[in-house]
């Protein structure tokens, strides 16, 4: 399967650089998987598309201010992007510098260069850094870090991004990118969903910087996914099984919720799904057999990205690419701060030919 099959033309003007004034004020393109039919609307239309007893599964990760600027004590400037917090004093990070720091290199981090750190070891493309500070890592990042806006949002981060690039239900710090489908849910929307009898459950997947890495191979099967830490606790498993038993739908809010639930299903030995705590490298592309998800809320994804492949595996390749062409023609806003889709599963997607 060719990566190029997932390309589409996207005018630069359709990339959203700022969010909507109201979280739930975005547009919603609904794609009916079985028929391929498209419906244009607004995000609050989602209320009418869900039935009492349906289960929405959210990702409650919280974005950390993971981008740091500074220099080596010896002089060279550098930029640090945290990939993972290892413990209270150590991180794994991407480091951009004219010359990669060697083990033992001392760093001065923060806009005022007030925080000392040491490069301890290199692990492939990532650097292990130790903060020489009495505060824990998250406190340091909150004090000196910048919000890690995606590379396609071509502007410096602003103070407002600390909350805007964050879901209202985020609880577990550790992500370096927001689970962006969740950005559209505000408190009134969540209250309206509860009032209608929609069930809710929360997984955790700490989105890594690898989510923005382009696919660098020509053939999809050759791509190796980055690892991300995910948790699907027992209460989520119970909610999913109860939802299925009563004949309702499991609806994932975002591709990270999809990947968490499907990882838990893959790891389960004898039940449809079991609790999951650990790294996942699940790569979902056409031909994948979905085990848990019946519908999906998601944003519009980058051309040739693993996420448009995931959507194609769910809704069908032709359905997905047609929907994206329609979204471009109708000038929907794309990517993290953009508009949303509501998609139901196509039973034919698994067998469909790509290209």
Swiss-Prot record:
The keyword Aminoacyl-tRNA synthetase does not apply. InterPro entries: QueA, QueA_dom1, QueA_dom2, QueA_sf. GO terms for molecular function: S-adenosylmethionine:tRNA ribosyltransferase-isomerase activity. Its main location: cytoplasm. Pathway: tRNA modification; tRNA-queuosine biosynthesis. The keyword tRNA processing does not apply. Monomer. Belongs to the QueA family. Transfers and isomerizes the ribose moiety from AdoMet to the 7-aminomethyl group of 7-deazaguanine (preQ1-tRNA) to give epoxyqueuosine (oQ-tRNA). This is S-adenosylmethionine:tRNA ribosyltransferase-isomerase. It comes from Pectobacterium atrosepticum (strain SCRI 1043 / ATCC BAA-672).
């Amino acid at each position: 399967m060719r990566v190029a099959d997932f390309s589409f033309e996207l005018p630069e003007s359709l990339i959203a650089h700022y969010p909507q004034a109201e979280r739930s004020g975005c547009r919603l393109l609904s794609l009916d998987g079985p028929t391929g039919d498209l419906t244009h609307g607004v995000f609050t239309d989602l209320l009418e598309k869900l039935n009492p007893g349906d289960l929405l599964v959210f990702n409650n990760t919280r974005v950390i201010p993971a981008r740091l600027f500074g220099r080596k004590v010896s002089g060279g400037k550098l930029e640090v992007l945290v990939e993972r917090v290892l413990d209270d004093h150590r991180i794994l990070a991407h480091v951009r510098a004219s010359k990669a720091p060697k083990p033992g290199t001392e760093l001065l981090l923060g806009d005022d260069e007030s925080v000392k750190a040491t490069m301890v070891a290199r692990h492939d493309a990532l650097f292990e850094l130790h903060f020489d500070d009495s505060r824990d890592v998250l406190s340091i990042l909150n004090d000196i870090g910048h919000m890690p806006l995606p590379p396609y949002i071509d502007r410096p981060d602003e103070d407002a991004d600390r909350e805007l690039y964050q879901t209202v239900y985020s609880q577990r710090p550790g992500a370096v990118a927001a689970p962006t489908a969740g950005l559209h849910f505000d408190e009134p929307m969540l209250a309206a969903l509860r009032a209608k009898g929609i069930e809710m459950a929360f997984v955790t997947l700490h989105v890594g910087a690898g989510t923005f890495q382009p696919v660098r191979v020509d053939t999809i099967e050759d791509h190796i996914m980055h690892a991300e830490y995910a948790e699907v606790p027992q209460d989520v498993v119970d909610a999913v099984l109860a939802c299925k038993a009563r004949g309702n739908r499991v609806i994932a809010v975002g591709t990270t919720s999809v990947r968490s639930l499907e990882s838990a299903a893959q790891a389960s030995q004898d039940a449809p799904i079991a609790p999951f705590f650990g790294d996942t490298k699940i790569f979902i592309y056409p031909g994948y057999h979905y085990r848990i998800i019946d519908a999906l809320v998601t944003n519009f994804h980058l051309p040739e990205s693993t996420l448009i492949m995931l959507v194609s595996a769910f809704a069908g390749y032709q359905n997905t690419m047609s929907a994206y062409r329609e979204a471009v023609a109708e000038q929907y806003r794309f990517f993290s701060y953009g508009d949303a889709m509501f998609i139901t599963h196509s039973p034919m997607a698994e067998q469909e030919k790509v290209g």
